[in-house]
């Protein structure tokens, strides 16, 4: 039975509206629930002063419903039903883009002039569409997904989705940090370590979060350098002089892991006797040193002190501390074995002043053989570019790779 012009118009408009609505709802919910949830949690925590908590499910559902209701309101006003129906979603996408770009501390930035300008351009496009659409003769086109009207509208939606992605914070490290903090806040160290584990991008804050998560699992000396590491000994804790900062997680979670909070440490003179130091003004090294004499402290500080020395490539400091905290046997964590073999090789079996001779009695044949393989790459691959590529492929994740590749 042939479809007359009136029935064709109603059926095709309905099909287009449903398809656009489904695509919009799927994209918006997925974007808010999976991609932006952690960033929104950080932003809401900062903007509310820590008084409110963002729930990814509730937040995604409510936001999606509100944005769709905004679309319905716009549609009721402008009544675009044909090839430009997708334009009725523009205000919703604009609001979604704004929400996705919000960070803490808050700043309007370019939105003060960009949002009014974009709305003005959108208004012009709507006016033009209402003038042009009545003249479009599409009654002979296929109905449904294969119609030109359908694909023109879907294309417009896709362009707006790409616009949302373009103005949102898509920085990988920012998302890694936010997700890691959310995971640690819920006591999930495994998830905090999983996020971004294959990426080479990091910063001081993400390194600090991974150090904390590994310490919780008792694997700090075993796995730290399997991740990219940046910063210095000052950045292993969010204290004085550190570039590493927490955005969402309360710092008390870290201090409870050590058993002693910085603010509870009594005033004490520094090593030169020239200043008095209050707990909240401690550097990471001063805080960790103070824990060694505190009966309430857990043993977590030991690995922190060792990896802090390794991060700074201070092998003498590492060698002095290692025998105090670990028995030199086969149970020594992987990175400590690697650092110890490296120290022995660099000192040619001659200890530096203060380093016990027992450090050179320890032998690990497998680690030593692997070190020899690493060391031979200088002669096997004389070209620096080729050597760098091969070394990264075969030895990334070892302390040796970190030690010799660190700027």
Locations of regions flagged by a protein language model:
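Membrane-anchoring hydrophobic segments
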Residues: 1-91
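Membrane-embedded alpha-helical segments of integral membrane proteins
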Residues: 85-140
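Internal/C-terminal transmembrane anchor helices
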Residues: 144-171
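Hydrophobic, aromatic-rich alpha-helical transmembrane segments
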Residues: 52-61, 107-115, 146, 150, ...
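Canonical alpha-helical transmembrane segment with a positive-inside/aromatic-interface signature
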Residues: 138-148, 168, 176, 180
